[in-house]
Structures are given as C-alpha cells and as structure tokens.
A protein has these predicted regions:
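Acidic/glycine-enriched connector segments
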Residues: 1-121
Length: 121
C-alpha cells in the first residue's frame, strides 16, 4: 500500500475495517515508502501502530525523488496478483502504474469504472 493520496488512505482504512470484522490472522497491511518521508520520520510511532509492516524501497530511495514513486509502484505491482485502483484518466503516475500492471498480466480492478472493472480502464 502506498500513502500518496486520498485513495491510498481510503483503501488502508477499508483493509483495517475488514481485518477488524473478520480477523487479522491471514492478512496484513504493509506500507511501502519510496524513501523515508518527513511525515514518516516525524510520526514513526503512529505509523507503526497503524500498519502491520513498513518497508522502504531500496531501489526507489536511491533514485531521484521524482522517479522514486514510479519505481516503488512498479515494485508493488511486481509483488501483487491483484491491483485495485481508482484511475479516471489515461495520464499521470497512477495511470502509468496501471498500464504497467496490465502489461505484466496482473488483474486490475479500477473502482472508477462502474461497468467493466477487471483488466479494463
């Protein structure tokens, strides 16, 4: 899970609600940061209380900050079987990540698309 926008916060909250309702014995909520952000460094204890695991991408943290998020996003796609997103237009970093996921043969559910959400945008 990233932490770059409203959708990331909403998705994290949904995962925690489901874990609370059905139990957390078979799930975790992992935050993957592109580099140690100031927000994380200044609030490390609250982050550790909220997330099951916190990782910092080595490859992303070694890159220029503008490239770091895309590197981190691709790493998350590579580790995933299912990608859930909310992408309304075919431009920007989120779109590039979804495009990459589709190229990798991942199942993509786009919550912004009400009619056809699996592997379609």
């Amino acid at each position: 899970m990233g932490r770059s926008g409203d959708f990331d916060q909403y998705a994290s909250s949904a995962v925690l609600r489901v874990r609370k309702a059905v139990g957390d014995h078979n799930s975790s909520l992992t935050l993957v940061l592109p580099y140690p952000t100031a927000e994380y460094l200044n609030n490390q204890e609250s982050f550790e209380d909220y997330y099951s695991y916190i990782e910092v991408s080595d490859a992303a943290s070694a890159a220029h900050h503008k490239a770091a998020y895309q590197i981190r996003n691709r790493e998350m796609v590579d580790r995933s079987d299912l990608v859930v997103c909310y992408v309304e237009r075919e431009s920007g970093g989120a779109w590039q990540t979804v495009k990459y996921a589709l190229e990798q043969g991942k199942t993509v559910i786009n919550l912004a698309n009400e009619d056809e959400s699996v592997n379609l945008l």
